[in-house]
Amino acid sequence: MLLEFDADQRLWQETVRDAVGKQCPPALVRGVAEDGVDPTPVWKAYVEHGWTEMNDPQTAVELAIVLEELGRATDPTPFLATMSQFAPLAADRFDSQASGTAVYRGVTAHRDEDAWGLDGTAKHVLDGDRAEWLAVVTDAAVFIVSADEVAGQVSRRRSAVFDPVLHVADLTFDGVRVPDTARVSVDVERARHIALMGMAMTMVGACQRILDLVLEHVRSRHQFGVPIGSFQAVQHKAADMHVAVERARALAYYAALTIAGDDPRRRLAAAMAKAAAGECQSLVFRHGLQLFGAMGFTWENDLQFALKRAKAGELMLGGAAEHRAMITEEYRAAQL
């Protein structure tokens, strides 16, 4: 893929979009939020489709296509955490049938005779309360831990977040002993680039969903006998939303391309993707609510799910300001 999808990628996108539309419709998302419907069958469907087998960095673009569509659908399964955070760290120990997540900060490791001891508290771990496997990143090494095996030693408390179908949890490790065989040798930095790309791609999908709903609304909502979409002020805001989404999408796919090609620019590309996605959600969030008016604030409107997913993405793995600062430091260092 250079500047646009080739025929195979377009077919892949259409296939994924069709499958997501059937497996994860808005009614299911609302059912999960309101009635606690179990999304496990949806996760199993993704596994059966083979989507969890895209754990090779070379398939980053294909994975990005899936993540964008799942972001658009406000996917309630652990796919994002599993494929963009856990799989890159698990390397050859990744099981495509099981869910997982990554613990990036807050946990330390120390030698405990012939094993290792893990201590500390990790805050706001995506799917930390329901993942079957944990990839724990410490200064000493990365450890792949079965959640079942340490169930009595790790406290997993789900946090209350504004996205009703998103699972975020605090994990506390108190002297958890893991064998030396749990250690893996993996490029943590590259894994983090994939995580950033994945989160950015999900945010792009959510922002596209917001834009789609807004365009549908301004075409059907009438004032003074005409659709409100015919007013120039409304058109300007919709155009700004479209430009922001396209910019964020381009940078997110650029990040996926650099990851797939093992390009040394992937660190900057991942940071630019996350920064652009954060800026995009800010603009799309504000304009989307304004163009919808009071209806956009109601629980009955599906707009809320996409808004919350986009905003939640900004709050994880560093916001736009943090990544812009990193990009600035990189360029300043290069000029010295």
Predicted regions and their residues:
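Short glycine-rich, polar/acidic loop-and-turn segments at beta strand-coil junctions
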Residues: 58-59, 70-71, 83, 122, ...
